[in-house]
Amino acid sequence: MIKLNIDGSEIEVSEGSTVYQACTQAGKEIPHFCYHERLKIAGNCRMCLVEMEKSPKPIASCAMPVSNGMVIHTDTPMVKKAREGVMEFLLINHPLDCPICDQGGECDLQDQAFRYGKGTNRFHENKRSIKDKYMGPLIKTAMTRCIQCTRCIRFANDIAGIEEMGAIHRGEHMEVTSYLEQTLDSEMSGNMIDICPVGALNSKPYAFKARKWELKHTASIGVHDAEGSNIRIDSRGDEVMRILPRVNEEINEEWLSDKNRFSYDGLKYQRLDLPYIRKNGKLVEASWSEALKTIADKIKSVKPEKIAAIAGSLVSVEAMFMLKTLLQKLGSNNYSVNQFDYKFDTTQRGNYLFNTTIAGVEKADLCLLIGANLRQIAPVLNSRIGQRVRAGSLKVARIGEGHNQTYRIQDLGSDIKIIEELAIGTHEFTKALKAAKYPMIIVGDGVYARDDGYAILSLIHKIVAEYNIMRDDFQGFNMLHNHASIVGGLDIGFNTPIKLEELELTYLLGADELPFDKLKSAFIIYQGHHGDSGAANADVILPAAAYTEQSGIYVNLEGRPQIAEKAVAPVGVAKEDIEIIKELAGSLKIDIGMDNLQEVRVRLAKEYKIFANIDKIVESKFAKFSFKDKLSKEPITMGPINYYMTDVISKNSVTMAKCVEAKEKRNERAA
């Protein structure tokens, strides 16, 4: 520990800390622009100047390491004058257009100019003006406002892992740019908007829509992937205006993927706001009572074993649990969250979880990806791994034909024989597995989406056992899920095998990705919020609330249950999922023993201990899985993935459609 004096108080800080960090620990407010605790130090802005005894001039506290016996002053006349001077220089070329700037009201420059500036301007010459840059459909630029803090450049290099931002020219003529002025290639580019301390980088979809003080803030969870990123929904009235990240050190830190951030406009289009019944081959509007009576009459006429429920990728645990309870009361045990027919082993909970945990990857020293496209399936997790790789603390290898990653990776090939050789110890890479202290394996849909997925998974379990990858001090076996509802559904047993061709009645709870040709003879009920393929094939449509319009629990890929709170009201006469299921049970004269959300959660917590520990990870058991089957000769591939359109909300997002178009144009230029 290092001892130093700050404004007359003795404090101790860790060796390697900066003066800025020491001052912050001592409770001192130090203004800054370029410094960010998650980025490398740049020392560009000089706003963090403090006085150090025996130094003839102020020092940049963000770049100065602490040493024993230092005496620091943060509020002397010298410091005040230095900060006033720095602020005056920063404002020389700034346009001072706060009334029309989207950053107004939440701008670091605005706040610090008011707190530390002089209040008068001595500069009367012409200001510098810079042409705005094109960075794609997500980021709107106003580069005349840029103060060259280089946060965006450092984020692109250090966090996103794609070196596509930089500075050109020098001095007053310096410009921050994306070089070729084309769409940014990162799936996390929106975070540059958050870390920009001025209004140089703004959200293009949110431009000129609202001011911060007009918005209601609601804590929620990102549902467009299985990471469980913590988000804040900003709404005005019943409209979602924007989505921002919330800090959660164990999951997303303070970052957010572009799909979770920008796809919210999909909530406005193709919404189901009325019940519908198919009559004479056409869907016609109906009342709630008429729709529920039609369903109840049909259910009574069908044998229980011919009834099944299938949940989609955006469904909450409470909705699945309530529907499961209803089906069991009817005498049916056919229900599944697995609309893609993924090959999951549910022998033990640890067999289908990301056991290392998202934060735990920082302990690993070797990572083997098998059929896993981390960059597009889990961008935030991919960023964590990339930072470790660039720091030289982690080596990553891959089995499977895949997409470009944002870090150096050893490509082992895509042949199934590689996994077989690893299982028996004859492959060259086994040396690395044996030498690693904390090896981890990540299994993606390139494995569990295959017909021979169980057989491959059995081989992977042999590798796990052979190299002691699952042990008390480090659990290195991980399943990489790609949908928000899957882990929660598996946790409550909403995963029984279903033969679609034999069904006479199918209840689709937000499920749109089924092979509907296998359901031609079935009566289809669709409960959901968007008019997609599920609604198009339905005989009865029940309009439901989206994730922003109801409260629900989602379990992320590491097994952590989290609550997404209700931000706005449902559209039209749409209702919340559990309310619809409760009313349907009433129409069937069935008592499912749960009348509201609180009662559902109490029952969940009693039956499954993980739901008594919200926001926490409960220790899960792991068991070796063995399955004998013929292996396909097909190579392991991740397949083409349209990152921006993976569910009914993102598919109906105009912003996501623009991203797809912009990415295609970028790829054409690259070709």
Swiss-Prot record:
Q: Which GO terms describe its biological process?
A: ATP synthesis coupled electron transport
Q: Which PROSITE patterns match?
A: 2FE2S_FER_2, 4FE4S_HC3, 4FE4S_MOW_BIS_MGD, COMPLEX1_75K_1, COMPLEX1_75K_2, COMPLEX1_75K_3
| Tree of life domain | Bacteria
- Matching Gene3D superfamilies: 3.10.20.740, 3.30.70.20, 3.40.50.740, Dimethylsulfoxide Reductase, domain 2 (3.40.228.10)
GO MF annotation, one: 4 iron, 4 sulfur cluster binding
Catalytic function, reaction form: a quinone + NADH + 5 H(+)(in) = a quinol + NAD(+) + 4 H(+)(out)
For this UniProt record, give its keywords in alphabetical order, as a comma-separated list: 2Fe-2S, 4Fe-4S, Iron, Iron-sulfur, Metal-binding, NAD, Quinone, Translocase
- Listed binding positions for [2Fe-2S] cluster are 34, 45, 48, 62
GO CC, alphabetical: membrane
- Specify which residues bind [4Fe-4S] cluster 2 according to the UniProt entry for this protein: 146, 149, 152, 196
SUPFAM superfamilies the UniProt entry points to: 2Fe-2S ferredoxin-like, 4Fe-4S ferredoxins, Formate dehydrogenase/DMSO reductase, domains 1-3
Instruction: Tell me how the cofactor is bound.
Output: Binds 1 [2Fe-2S] cluster per subunit. Binds 2 [4Fe-4S] clusters per subunit.
Q: Does the keyword 4Fe-4S feature in the UniProt annotation? A: yes
Domain (2Fe-2S ferredoxin-type) spans 1-78
Using the record's annotation, list all stretches that form the 4Fe-4S His(Cys)3-ligated-type domain: 78-117
What EC number is given for this enzyme? 7.1.1.-
Biological role:
NDH-1 shuttles electrons from NADH, via FMN and iron-sulfur (Fe-S) centers, to quinones in the respiratory chain. Couples the redox reaction to proton translocation (for every two electrons transferred, four hydrogen ions are translocated across the cytoplasmic membrane), and thus conserves the redox energy in a proton gradient.
Please give the family membership noted in the entry.
Belongs to the complex I 75 kDa subunit family.
What name does UniProt use for this protein? NADH-quinone oxidoreductase subunit G
Lineage in the entry? Bacteria, Pseudomonadati, Pseudomonadota, Alphaproteobacteria, Rickettsiales
